[in-house]
Amino acid sequence: MSKEWKGNKKSVSTMLGMSTTWHPENRAAGDYYTIDPTAVEDFMQHLKRNYCDTRYYEELFNVVWEPACGCGNISEVVKKYANKVISTDLYDRGYGHTGVNFLKTTKLPEDCMCIITHPPYSLSDEFIKHAMELLPRSARYFALLNISYLAGEKRFNDIYKNQYLRAIHIYPYRINCYKNNENTGHSSPVNYAWFEFGHKPQNYYSEDAKYPAKIYWIEK
């Protein structure tokens, strides 16, 4: 059974190598969207089906970090699949450990091999770069992003050319994503996918397969 990591703000900041903290006067801008938990459930079931190496799957989801946890929609689902979930956020949404700026952390939680989050869209590039700085070779970073995140010359040069995109897990149907966690009852007009990043394998050398990202479809 999954356990939520407990600790005070100081212990969390120390654990993640972060010296700066959030202050009550800070408030989030409008870049706050939450995903419907049923869509997270579909994704986690999809991963469980597609990771053929059961031992690696268990290692990957032993300790999971959600660094932009918001109100906990992702964390609460992942807790059913992981041994431990550490939930942090810069802002106080009433869930997890607040005042933790992911971009200022210098180390992972102990035994963490997986970061999974729905990052602020305006900071998507920075989240990817920082996650790749923190993660060891066999670890993974999963980010929920607009499918259009694949496009753009600048992004190609800054992200895809230098990082290792392992897979794209696409929702073939529209999922519910709520601004400021306000359920309007309508599905999002945006198409979403989970982008899976990881470092190049140690024996990776083929120039002919420079960007071997796989495409998966998430079925209900």
Q: Model-predicted segments: where are they?
A:
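Class I S-adenosyl-L-methionine-dependent methyltransferase catalytic core
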Residues: 1-220
